[in-house]
């Protein structure tokens, strides 16, 4: 699995290398994006400042991998997932919404898909943030890289009485 090229920025999908998207892990790709850009997905950063756009694959077939595609969007790279979201094979909305979206895509109407992908982007960002929170080595790595306080370290210092103020 190739990592992001250290000399390229995330403003181009070619920074992800030539490895097919279906061979990659969602979590590893997002970790690479965060390391390269220095921006935490799922935080209080405005949408246009986030380095990538997270989308959901509208296909209703069984997903073969976590990631469907990594492609260059209009302004930033787009990562399309197939394991989570409001619509698609694993979607939370009723099946007829996914079928409606697929029908509209065939007619070159992307409005409903793009509208729901606004919410999918936020849901996927928060999903990644929750995963990171419960994987202590990853959360420690992120906190160290961003020069932020690590939650686990704070709890451990509190247990031995060194974190208390006063």
Residue spans for each PLM region:
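The feature captures two recurrent sequence modes
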Residues: 1-92, 100
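Core of folded catalytic or high-affinity ligand/protein-binding domains
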Residues: 70-166
């Amino acid at each position: 699995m190739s990592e992001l090229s250290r000399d390229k920025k995330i403003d181009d999908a070619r920074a992800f290398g030539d490895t097919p998207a279906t061979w990659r892990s969602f979590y590893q790709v997002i970790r690479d994006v965060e390391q390269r850009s220095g921006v935490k997905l799922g935080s209080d950063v405005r949408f246009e400042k986030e380095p990538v756009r997270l989308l959901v694959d509208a296909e209703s077939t069984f997903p073969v991998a976590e990631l469907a595609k990594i492609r260059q969007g209009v302004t930033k790279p787009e990562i399309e997932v197939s394991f989570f979201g409001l619509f698609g094979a694993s979607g939370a909305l009723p099946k007829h919404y996914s079928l409606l979206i697929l029908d509209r895509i065939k007619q070159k109407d992307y409005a409903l898909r793009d509208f729901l992908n606004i919410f999918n982007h936020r849901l996927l960002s928060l999903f990644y943030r929750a995963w990171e929170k419960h994987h202590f080595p990853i959360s420690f790595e992120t906190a160290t890289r961003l020069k932020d306080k690590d939650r686990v370290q704070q709890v451990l210092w509190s247990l031995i009485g060194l974190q208390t103020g006063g």
